[in-house]
A protein has these predicted regions:
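Boundary at the C-terminal end of the N-terminal hydrophobic targeting segment
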Residues: 19-24
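Bacterial N-terminal signal peptides that target proteins for export
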Residues: 1-8, 18
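Sequence-level preference for short, compositionally simple segments enriched
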Residues: 25-323
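Core hydrophobic alpha-helical transmembrane segments of single-pass membrane proteins
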Residues: 12-13
Length: 323
């Protein structure tokens, strides 16, 4: 994790004396004790002006604390950047799970459980923890992303089943910590994980990609490491939520937590013919190319070299968050 920015403290002190009128501001400030403009993250997001742009984003500075609230960056709230004071001490959390009754009295189901929802394009977050504290009770999302061009740096994502849903669009994760046990990184988006720590709490599956057939990439993990909560934990690199699921691990350190076969077919042999699973230069006790399922690939050095942030996330607009 990166050290706390020295600039944050100065900005936070400056924000304490700023009036609540935010129509022309690009910096908003949040603290639980009420010493700044807002006491909740959602209040600050709601106050984001309509004048944001690539050169004039709205930066929301969040003081350390545990913010128990549902957070929603609505579609019109583009170019918003959430900056926490410290990743381990600045926590956005809630505790919904799929079995809980919703307003209609019926179980909420997976997609109504996220603690944080990002519908806006061009969202960024750094030095924050996104958590669903429901525990091992079934599907309970910490984060759902439907916006395009979202970037997360030095963030922590804590949950059990279905921790992160990357539903659509493109996302970039750098230096992040992601914990869970079943399908805890899932969805149909294109996402690049760079220098991230993936932690498996108990037996399960890391990924459950639902990549569309026409989409060249799903989830790419580059220079990451995979660990387990205890030596007895065994997990799979992924299983195909949809037939053309695409997941690639590049130069990733794998502890003994990984099942030797690597991948699971979700009890559907037909998906072995369509799933796009690959590795290159996996290392550690969990890296055993000879033991992997025959329907997953080991890439050549030339193939792996071509899988870059720019190639995976560039799209028609040339987005490159790794700059």
């Amino acid at each position: 994790m990166r050290p706390q920015s020295l600039l944050f403290g100065a900005l936070l002190l400056l924000g304490a004396g700023v009036a609540r009128s935010v129509s022309a501001q690009t910096n908003l400030y949040v603290s639980l004790d009420g010493s700044n403009q807002f006491k909740s993250v959602q209040e600050a997001i709601n106050a984001v002006p309509q004048t944001t742009s690539p050169t004039n984003p709205c930066i929301i500075h969040i003081k350390a604390g545990t913010y128990k609230e549902l957070v929603h960056a609505q579609r019109e709230k583009r170019f918003v950047r959430l900056v926490g004071e410290d990743a381990e001490k600045t926590v956005l959390t809630y505790n919904l799970n799929a079995k809980m009754p919703g307003a209609d009295g019926k179980p909420m189901g997976t997609f109504r459980t996220p603690s944080t929802i990002i519908d806006a394009d061009d969202f960024m977050a750094e030095n924050l923890t996104f958590e669903n504290s429901a525990g091992p009770v079934g599907q309970a999302l910490a984060l759902r992303v439907d916006g395009d061009r979202a970037a997360f740096r030095n963030c922590r994502f804590l949950g059990w089943q279905d921790t992160i849903l990357l539903n659509r669009g493109r996302q970039y994760f750098e230096g992040c910590y992601i914990a869970g046990h079943v399908d805890f990184i899932f969805g149909g988006a294109t996402a690049f994980f760079e220098n991230c720590h993936i932690h498996c709490l108990t037996n399960g599956y890391i990924t459950a990609a639902s990549t569309p057939q026409e989409q060249p990439f799903g989830f790419v993990f580059s220079n990451c490491r995979v660990t387990g909560e205890s030596p007895g934990v065994k997990t799979y690199l992924g299983r195909p939520w949809r037939p053309f699921s695409s997941v690639t691990y590049l130069n990733t350190e794998m502890s003994g937590v990984i099942q030797p076969v690597g991948w699971n077919n979700w009890k559907d042999p037909a998906r072995e013919k369509t799933a796009r699973y690959a590795e290159f230069n996996s290392t550690g006790p969990g890296a055993d190319p000879k033991a992997r399922v025959p329907w997953a690939r080991q890439l050549t050095a030339e193939e792996a070299k071509a899988i870059t942030v720019e190639k995976v996330l560039g799209g028609p607009d040339g987005w490159n968050p790794g700059k």
